[in-house]
């Protein structure tokens, strides 16, 4: 038996080597792209963008809009993820597919759909009253449309992994359904909540297509960091675009790691 185990392990070596090579190639590509940006950028480029009033505004708007979007995404993702995990109903597969649409649709299509919704339907009156399209609310709504889908998917997976037994025990001990949810389910799902919040914030930070179409790219109004990269490239300032890109990478890594 020991000899056969040794032979089996030797025979498994090519399999694992192949996996490591493929994984290393992918990870290496990501690292190479980041290192290329770092090699190209200079400290003076960062000084230049941080001294730019427009870039400072985009940093501020990005942080605020991503934070608001994350709260809204969790507010929606918690009940939706719980319902999709715990309750069986007719048409569930269809609803599940609809929830994935923002993930699979091209970002520009999402932005265009939002623009049509608020400019070519009865919701136009709401847009005229509140000033949504091409204003800051459009930035948040565009981010929310995509980030919430990732949050829903994450929390549904979290609730799927939680055994309903503890919840049932709480119900038998006299808790109402809402009390069991708040006192038992949510505390157990705290890591999933943190993961969903982190993913929603980071995804919102990198959102560009829907914002460009639905909110525009106006300086000092709807300019977030991805839009800043676009505008800097449009005027031929590659150094500034790379510096802003690395700033976004740093912010995303900080959120994901911390």
For the regions a protein language model found, what residue spans apply to each?
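Short hydrophobic faces within alpha-helices
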Residues: 101, 165-173, 241
């Amino acid at each position: 038996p020991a000899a056969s185990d040794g032979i089996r392990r030797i025979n498994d070596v090519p399999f694992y080597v192949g996996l490591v090579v493929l994984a290393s190639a992918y990870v290496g590509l990501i690292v190479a792209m980041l290192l290329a940006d770092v090699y190209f950028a200079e400290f003076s480029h960062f000084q230049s963008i941080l001294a730019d009033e427009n870039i400072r505004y985009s940093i501020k708007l990005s942080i605020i809009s991503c934070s608001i979007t994350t709260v809204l995404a969790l507010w929606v993702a918690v009940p939706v993820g719980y319902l999709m995990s715990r309750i069986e109903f007719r048409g569930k597969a269809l609803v599940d597919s609809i929830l994935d649409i923002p993930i699979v649709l091209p970002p520009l299509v999402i932005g265009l759909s939002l623009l049509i919704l608020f400019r070519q339907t009865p919701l136009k009156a709401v847009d005229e009253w509140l000033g949504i399209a091409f204003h800051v609310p459009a930035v948040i709504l565009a981010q929310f449309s995509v980030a919430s889908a990732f949050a829903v998917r994450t929390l549904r997976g979290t609730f799927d992994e939680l055994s309903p037994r503890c919840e049932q025990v709480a119900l038998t001990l006299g808790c109402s359904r809402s009390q069991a949810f708040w006192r038992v389910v949510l505390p157990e799902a705290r890591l999933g909540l943190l993961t969903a919040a982190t993913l929603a914030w980071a995804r919102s930070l990198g959102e560009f297509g829907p914002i460009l179409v639905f909110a525009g790219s106006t300086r000092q109004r709807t300019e977030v960091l991805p839009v800043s990269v676009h505008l800097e490239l449009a005027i031929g300032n590659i150094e500034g675009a790379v510096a802003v890109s690395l700033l976004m990478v740093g912010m995303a890594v900080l959120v994901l790691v911390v």
